[in-house]
């Protein structure tokens, strides 16, 4: 399982899984787009590069999702395919390629307002990583 949606009053929450950080960031992007737009009608029209960094994995994933929200809001862009490289060192850096296209208003399931820090967390487990994300709608 890559991700699952969780009942959450007045927000959308999802739990994301990855055997490594690359997979966690890729699956977080797929969960984000699946939550808010019907991607079945979107073709792969272009590739968008996204980079972000932070002092730890949680902050970097939070910033990653905010970059996706920015593209969603400003360019009406949704990805169907995602590739991410995550580097750990002096902080954490994520560099990704999003492949997808524009969506129309009819394709939007619900409009996201903000990625919240409420209950936001990333945990390392014996199977990899788990992240819990709440998005204000």
UniProtKB/Swiss-Prot annotation:
The protein's name in its UniProt record: Protein archease
Source organism per UniProt: Archaeoglobus fulgidus (strain ATCC 49558 / DSM 4304 / JCM 9628 / NBRC 100126 / VC-16)
Keywords for this protein: Calcium, Metal-binding, tRNA processing
Protein residues bound to Ca(2+): 11, 136-137
SUPFAM superfamilies: MTH1598-like
Any one Gene Ontology BP term: tRNA splicing, via endonucleolytic cleavage and ligation
PANTHER family: ARCHEASE, PROTEIN ARCHEASE
Membership in a protein family: Belongs to the archease family.
One term of GO molecular function: calcium ion binding
Known role: Activates the tRNA-splicing ligase complex by facilitating the enzymatic turnover of catalytic subunit RtcB. Acts by promoting the guanylylation of RtcB, a key intermediate step in tRNA ligation. Can also alter the NTP specificity of RtcB such that ATP, dGTP or ITP is used efficiently.
Xref: InterPro entries: Archease, Archease_arc, Archease_dom, Archease_dom_sf
């Amino acid at each position: 399982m890559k991700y699952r949606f969780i009942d959450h009053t007045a927000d959308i929450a999802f739990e994301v899984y990855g055997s490594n950080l690359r997979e966690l960031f890729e699956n977080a992007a797929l969960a984000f787009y699946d939550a808010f737009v019907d991607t079945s009608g979107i073709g792969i029209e272009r590739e968008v590069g996204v980079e972000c960094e932070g002092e730890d994995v949680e902050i970097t994933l939070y910033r990653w999702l905010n970059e996706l929200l920015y593209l969603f809001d400003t360019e009406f862009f949704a990805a169907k395919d995602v590739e991410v490289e995550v580097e750990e060192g002096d902080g954490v850096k994520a560099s990704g390629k999003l492949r997808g296209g524009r969506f129309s208003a009819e394709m939007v399931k619900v409009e996201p307002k903000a990625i919240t820090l409420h209950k936001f967390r990333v945990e390392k487990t014996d199977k990899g990583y788990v992240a819990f994300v709440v998005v204000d709608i």
